[in-house]
Every structure is written in structure tokens, then in C-alpha cells.
């Protein structure tokens, strides 16, 4: 794995196949626009976490020498190797380097150390579209039209390059500080046979275009039926995303992935009464079970999609110069000082990155003491009353920081459990009727051991190197769980 970035040399050789299946060798070389630099983590000051994935984190990072702020994607080499994700990482890097469009996130440079790979991406200070939907409850039709038009404009370019994104959703639609959309996260991208993107022979997302990737709520029925991927996959996800903008929730939301898939296959979709006729019609067409009938995928291509009545009044030639909708601020930022630099806030345990990154931050902000951290977690955490029944599951000296009745979701079923976060640190889930421990998660000082991903206000996933556990909190406190666990990690 140490040689991974070395393969991203300034010159690449591509072995290609002809469309008729005969093996034809062809050479193609190009220079990377985003170079591999000799930077180290010590060259940056780290701030808040933008997002967490199964093998990566994206964090706000300021380059000390220039003051430039990036969204630094930090990928765990060990996990990438173990989970056979090398090809995905290479392909994302190669694709981002070659895409040039105002609606697509930019890659500036890469570097690596002994434990991690780094991609310095454009920092979108407006956050995720998902956050705007959550803060506003739902978007107005004018807001949804503006954002959808910008996504359509970027998708048209992506598809013209012979690429399928395969993970279009509100979380992957980022907003600039002035409110324009940028499509991000090309970790699931699929080059088509006639793609204009140059790739390495060993940098392909998968050999079979029907391989399941993406996010359950946005997956089209043809993928569930193992049909090859097409541009129509992204258009289905666009329809789901537009529905979510206008309603506040995804169209096929259910208690488990299995139930979501059943609703997708059955096309079990209900339109709220407040949807306009034009919005309802566009979503209905984008969610056609036949991929080739979706607007944008047929013989007329994106011309048919852009002329749909929902987009009446959209100036397609000047999208990026139009005034975007006003962004709803992060409620947490309302209590912060306006002069506060995020780079010095939101302390993040970075001891797993580089050789001794924690040392470099000592001069910037002292980490909170154990008592301070425990106190802040306790204020966040004890959201359900604690009774003596749960004491039997604790070790001597161990205390409960957060506890709640939740559902543990599996593919087909869900089970009620009592989820307990302790100061060990440890997570325990208990069968509340039998008072039997069903499992526990203990993690070390390495924050890569455990990541929390919020998928909706009530749903969250706890990811470890060995497994991913999905939970539903009926009181919609998924973000509270995430904050409590991450605060404990950063103690």
C-alpha cells in the first residue's frame, strides 16, 4: 500500500480493449493537473469534521504556509487494502483530476504518509444540501428548482464524459459559501465503455457494471435486479433527491434496507398534496422503472429533461451567475463568536494521522481535561432516564454517558435494544425484555476504529473495521448520538 501513490505518476499507460471485444493495446499518457505533493500533516491546521465514511474522513484543513482552506479527505491505507478498495480510491483520484466543471468539486493535490492517503479538495463552506433540507424542514419549489437545475447541469457534463456517478443524494451535493451546488464523492463512479476519461487498467470500480453500490434509498430497481448500470441510474437518484427536497424525506423511506428495496421494486411511492403538478410529473418520470424512459436518458438526452415544465423560467446558460436561495445557518454556529476561526475549534483527535500530529497542535489549543469532556458528554447524553436495571452491565468504575431505547436494524428485521454509551469508552446494546447483552463495541484511541454516519434524523450507522451496525432512534436523535460518541473520541 505504501506504493499506491507512486502509481499515480505524472505519466500513465492505459491498456484498452476495442468495443468488439478484441484485445487491442493502446498507449495514452497525460500529466496530472493535481500533483502529488511532498506535504505532511504537519503542514496543516485541522478544524471541524465535514464528514465520515467507512474508510475515510473529510476535515477542514488550513495550509499553514498559505492560509488556504481545503476539505482534506483522509483515507486509511490499512482499511483500503483489507477491504479491497484500492481500485475505487485510484479511480476517484483519476476521475476528479480530469473533470472540469463549476458544478463539480475540485481536486487540488494529493499526498500520503505511512498510514493515510490524502486528497485536498475544494472546501464548500455552505455544507451539504441534506443539512439545508433538515434545517428548513423542506425546500420551497423555487429553491428545489434552482438546486435541481444546477445538479442537472453538472450531471449532463458527467454523463457527456461517459461517467455514471452512482451515488447522487443530498449528502453528496455540497454548497459553496454563496449557495451554488457542487457534486462530490466520486468513490462509486463508473466509466462507460466510451468514456472520455483515461483510466489505469487496475483503477476500475468493478468489472461488472451491475455491482451494487450507492445508498439504499436512492438505488434504482434495475440495480436491485442486477441489470447493468446506465446513465438512468443517476436520473432515478435525481428524482429521489428532488422528492426529498420538496418533502423533507426520501420517497422510499422505511425501517430497514430490505423494506426500502421492496418499496423500490414495487414502486411504492406516495406524493404529498403540496407537490405541484409539474414537480409531481417530473419526479414520476424520473422514477420510471424503465431507465431509458427517464428524462435525460432517452434519444433526446438532456434536451428533454431541461424543457420539462418544472424548469420553466430557468436560464440554463447563466445558472452560475444567478442568485442562489438563502442558506439556513447551522444552529450550532449561532452561539459561536463571529470572529472565531473554525480551524481552532472543534478539536479532533488526529493521533492516527502521520507520525505525531497531536504534538503539533499543542500550541494551538489545549485539549479538554477528562472531567471537562465527561461533563460535556453528560450534558448531551443522558437523554432517557437511567434505572438500576442497566447497572448490571457495567464494569466497576464504569459510568453511563448516554442511554436510549432504539431499534437495531438488519436486512429484513429490526429488534428493540437498549443502547448504552459508557466512559470506558464502550457501546453496549442490550435486549430490554431478556436483559441480555446482545453485543458491545469497544474502541481504542485510534478514532479510525469507529465512525458514526447519520443517514437521517432518526437513523445512524456505527462503522467499525469489522462490521457496520444500523440503528433507528424514534425520537430523531441520530445527530445527538453521533455528537456524544465523537465527543468521547476527542476526549
UniProtKB/Swiss-Prot annotation:
GO terms for cellular component: cytoplasm; membrane. Activated by phosphatidic acid (PA) and in response to the fungal elicitor xylanase. Residues 185-222 are annotated as: Activation loop. Pfam families: PH_3 (PF14593), Pkinase (PF00069). GO terms for biological process: positive regulation of protein kinase activity; protein autophosphorylation. It catalyses: L-seryl-[protein] + ATP = O-phospho-L-seryl-[protein] + ADP + H(+); L-threonyl-[protein] + ATP = O-phospho-L-threonyl-[protein] + ADP + H(+). Residues 44-311 form the Protein kinase domain. It is an enzyme of class 2 (transferase). Ubiquitous. Keywords: ATP-binding, Cytoplasm, Kinase, Membrane, Nucleotide-binding, Phosphoprotein, Serine/threonine-protein kinase, Transferase. Phosphorylation on Thr-211 in the activation loop is required for full activity. PDK1 itself can autophosphorylate Thr-211, leading to its own activation. The keyword Metal-binding does not apply. This is 3-phosphoinositide-dependent protein kinase 1. The lineage of its organism: Eukaryota, Viridiplantae, Streptophyta, Embryophyta, Tracheophyta. The gene is PDPK1.
